[in-house]
Regions:
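C-terminal structural segments of small proteins and small subunits
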Residues: 45-68
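Active-site beta-strand termini and strand-to-loop segments that position acidic
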Residues: 30-34
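Intrinsic low-complexity/disordered segments
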Residues: 24-25, 41
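Alpha-helix initiation/capping motif
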Residues: 2, 42, 46-47
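Histidine-centered active-site/metal-ligand motif
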Residues: 27-28, 44
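N-terminal first-folded block
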Residues: 1-24
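Short, charged/polar, Gly/Pro-enriched secondary-structure boundary elements
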Residues: 36-39
Length: 68
């Protein structure tokens, strides 16, 4: 699976109409109408997201590996 930074994943979410609700420290919290879950993305410079976190957030946002 392709590695992606938190900043790049945030851009991807915003392209898919996820809205930044708040920022808590270095974590950005996104929400979308029609979804109960929130997506929390850690922004630590340009460090890539851990694989487990990335897969879990992709599942919530309904993003496939091809869309990265």
């Amino acid at each position: 699976m392709k590695q992606i930074s938190g900043r790049d994943f945030c851009k991807l979410l915003e392209e898919r109409e996820w809205v930044l609700k708040r920022i808590s420290g270095s974590h950005h919290v996104y929400a979308k109408i029609g979804y109960r879950e929130r997506i929390v993305i850690p922004i630590h410079g340009n460090k890539p997201l851990k694989l487990g976190l990335l897969k879990a957030q992709m599942k919530i946002a309904e993003i496939t590996e091809d869309q990265l």
